[in-house]
UniProtKB/Swiss-Prot annotation:
EC top class named in words: transferase
Lineage: Eukaryota, Viridiplantae, Chlorophyta, core chlorophytes, Chlorophyceae
The protein's name in its UniProt record: Peptidyl serine alpha-galactosyltransferase
Gene name of this polypeptide: SGT1
Localization per record: Membrane
MF terms (GO), sorted A to Z: glycosyltransferase activity
Disulphide-bridged cysteine pairs: 415-449, 422-442, 431-446
Residue ranges, compositional bias (Basic and acidic residues): 611-637
Transmembrane segments: 711-731
Annotated organism of origin: Chlamydomonas reinhardtii (Chlamydomonas smithii)
Keyword Transferase: yes
Enzyme Commission number(s): 2.4.1.-
Thermal properties of activity per the entry: Optimum temperature is 30 degrees Celsius.
Amino acid sequence: MVAVFHGPLVLGALLLLLALQHGASAEEPGFANRTGVHVAFLTDCQMYSDWQSVGAAFSFKMSGQPGSVIRVMCCSEEQAKNYNKGLLGMVDTWVAPDATHSKRTGDRYAAYNKPEAVIDWLDHNVPKHDYVLVLDSDMVLRRPFFVENMGPRKGLAVGARYTYMIGVANELAVRHIPHVPPRNDTLAGPFGRRADQVGGFFFIHKDDLKAMSHDWLKFSEDVRVDDQAYRLSGDVYAIHPGDRPWISEMYGYAFGAANHNVWHKWDTFSMIYPGYEPREGIPKLMHYGLLFEIGKNYSFDKHWHYDFDVTVCPPWDLKDPKRRTHGIFPEPPRPSSLRKVFPKNGDMASMDDFIGYYKELLAIETLATLNAAFCDYHISHCPPSEQLVSVCKEVFSLYNEAREFIQEAEASYDCQDFHPKCEEWKESGECTKNENYMTENCRKTCDKCNKIEKFFPETTTKELEEKLAKMSKELQPLSEDPDNKAGAGSAPKTESPLVIPKQEQPVAIIPRNEVPPKQEVRASSPAMQSSPPPSPPPASPPPVDSPPPMSPPPESPSPDKPPPKVVTRKALADPKKVTQKALMVRCYKLSLGIDEVKDCVKAAKEGKEYEVPKRTKATDEEEEAPKAKHAESHLTLDGEGATTESANDEVAKTKAPDASAEGNEGKKNIRVVQRDLEDLSLTQGDGKKGKAPVIDAPVVGPSLHSLLGRLNTWQALVLWLVVVVAFLALVPRIAKLRRRQRSGMRTE
C-alpha cells in the first residue's frame, strides 16, 4: 500500500523541483549554461613569477569564469626538480622546458617561453574546452569571459588593442609574411595591414591556437634577429641599430596567426591597466604591468617586488610601509576613504568624477585581490599563528569592502551605452537580432538594465574566513594557559621573570633637558616613473628608493666568557603528550625574536621543546655600556622626519678603563654600535640586511660634547661672549693682512 503511493509522490516532487529550477533559470537567463572556457596563464619558475601565479589562480576562482584553469610554466630541469611542492599543487600545472635560449638563432630572450609553453602544452594535451583564454601571470581576472557575448569563432579570435604595433602595416610585415594579402577591414588594425595589432590576452579556438603555435615561436625568433626591426617595430626600447625589439614575441603571434589565416577583432575595454580610466566599459581583466598610484600617498609597481617570496610563513616583518619581501604587500587605502561619486543623467562633469572614483576602486581591488590570494595560500600551507589570523582577517575585510563598493559603482555604470551607434542599431532591430552584443554594449538604449543579469561574480571569502576562525580556536587554549597568557608568552608569577632579549628592548633617545614630542618616521613614497607602453619590462628591476635596512642587534659576548645560563619555561603539558604541532604553535606564542622563532620551529620539528636563553649579569652590564653611549647621541629631526646627528657626535665615544676586568690588564675597549639614525628603537634587524658599522673607541677622556653639556645657561653665555670678542679682535688683523697682499707687500 505504501509502495503504491510512494512512486507518484516522488514523481510529483521531481516535477515540482524541475519547475522551480526552470523558473530560476528564467530569472537569470543562461548563466549556468554558459560555454566553458579553458583559461591558461603562461609563466616561468622564478620567485618573481610565483606570487603572480598565486594571484592569477585565486582571481580565476573568484571571477565566476565558467570552465577550468591551468598554469603553463617553463622551467629548466634543475628548476623543475627543486620547485616548491606547495606551489606546484596550488593549481593544475603543466611544466614545459625552458626556451629562453633559442637553439636556432642563439639569441637569449625570456619571452620565447610564451610560445614554447603553448607548443609543449598542446603537443601533449587537448584543452578541456573548445575555447582557450591565454593570459599572462601578471593579470587579475575579475569578471568572466563569455563566448556567447564576445563572439570568438574558428578563424576569428578576440584580443586587446595595441596600435603601437606599426610593423603589421609597413616593411616589417613585407619582410616576414609577404605572401599574406593586405586586409581591407579595420576589425583589428588599419586598412592594408598583413597582420592584426593585438596583444595582452587572446580568446581563441583551441584548433587555431595549436595550428599557429609553432609559427608563433618561429616569427618571434625571426623578428628578434631582424637587423631592420629596430626602426620598423615601433618598440620604444629598440631605437638604435643593433637593438633587438622587446615586443618581438607580440609580432611573432600576429605574424603566426596571419600565416594560418587566423584573424582577430579588437576588444577595447575588457583589459585595462590599474590607473587607466575605464571609459569604454566595465573591465574584466586588470593587467598590473605598469606603475600606478592610488591617491597621493600610495603607489605600486610589480618591478619593486622581484624578491617577494610568497612561500614564507609567519613571523613576517611588515614594518616597511612601502616594500616587503614576504607576507603581504603594503595595504592600499580603504574604499571607504574615497569620496563617493555617481553619474547623473546629462551631466558630463559628474560622469568624469565618477570615472575617476571608479578608476581608484579598480586599483584598490587589484591590490586587495593579490593580498587575499597570498592569505589563501598561507592558510593552506602555514601552521596556525596569531599574526596569520590577525593579518588575514584585515586583508579579507579590505577585499570584501572593495568588492562591495565596486558592485555598487558598476550597478550605476552598467546602465550605459558604450558605443556611439547604439541608437542607429536599435532602429535596425539589432537589440533583438544581436541580443548578446547589444546587452554588452548598448544596455541603456536596448532597455536591458534591469532585465539581463550584470554578471557580477557572487563569490566571497566566507570559506577562508571560517578557516581563520577555526585556526583562531586552535590557538585559544594556548592563549588561556598561564604560561602563555593572550599569546604573549609571559612567565607565571611564581617563577623568575622572563628576560626580554636585548634586541627587543625599546630605547627612547631623549635630548638633554627636553622631552621631545612623539614623531613618526615614515618612508617616502617611491619615485614616480614614466609609464612605458604596455610591453614587458627589462629583466633587471629599476632602482627603488627604499629606506635603509635596520641594523642587526648588538653582537653576542666574546667566546672567552662563560656561556649564559638558561631558564626553562613551565611545560605547557605533559612532555610525553606534547605533539609537534603544539610545539610549533608554542614558538609563535612566545616573545621571541625572528631568529629565535626559527630556531624554535626547527627544534619543534625534531620533537624538542625550545629553551629560551637567559642573559647573565656580566652580559647585561656589557650590553648596557653601548646603550648608555648611544643615549648620549644628540639627534634632531629634519622637516621630513629623517633623523640626523650633530657634528659634535663625530668625536669618538669613549669609556674609562675598567681596572677590575680580568685578562685585559686594566684596559678594555668597549665596542660601540652605531645604529641607523632613522630607526629610533633597538629592534631586531633581518639577518639578510647589512651590518651596522662597528668602531673600537680608544680611551681618550670625556668628549667635548659631554663637557659643554654640563654648562648652565650663564656659563654658556659667558663662553660664547668670549668667543665673539676674540673673533672681533682678529678681524682688523685679517683685514690688514689682506690689504698687504693686494698691494704686493711681502708677508711672512
